Design a protein with these regions (language model features):
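Hydrophobic beta-strand-centered segment that forms part of the acyl-chain substrate-binding groove
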Residues: 44-86
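Hydrophobic residues in beta-strands and at strand termini
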Residues: 16-18, 75, 121
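Amphipathic alpha-helical recognition patches that constitute DNA-binding helices
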Residues: 33
Length: 133
């Protein structure tokens, strides 16, 4: 699964069309997909926010990447499949190498899940070679 997140003012947004096999019960997304979307979108938002805070263009060197230190998801409603899923995020805090992002997942016009991710910046010495160039 690959997603792309963009800024929409102070919020980040991702539109995703899940494959029908990401199902829990017929017609609804399984919880692991929901958690993965919140996680991936939130760590991407953390990286984008860090670039912004350093007044740098996205993907300039040295690269900024984040890993999940903590992921909390509250499942509010079953998320229907068959349409697009929207994930929105907002940065709550940037403190050194840590960024806290709150995100919510919208499907069928309703907020189906809320999440909070504590993301930590990957040290440059741990960056895979392909990301350093």
């Amino acid at each position: 699964m690959k997603i792309k997140s963009y800024w929409d003012g102070k919020e980040s947004v991702c539109i995703h069309q899940p494959k029908p096999y990401y199902t829990a019960i017929p017609g609804y997304a399984y919880g692991g997909l929901i958690a993965s979307l919140i996680d991936c979108h939130s760590t991407g938002t953390a990286a984008a926010a860090k670039y912004r805070s350093e007044k740098r263009e996205m993907d300039t060197l040295p690269p900024i990447r984040f890993l999940t230190a903590s992921l909390h998801v509250d499942y509010l409603l079953p998320a229907p499949l068959g349409g697009v899923i929207e994930i929105r995020g907002r940065v709550k805090e940037i403190k050194g190498r840590k960024v806290i992002v709150e995100s919510w997942l919208i499907a069928g016009g309703q907020i189906c899940a809320r999440g909070e991710v504590v993301a930590v910046q990957l040290p440059e010495h741990m960056m895979p070679d392909g990301f350093k160039k």
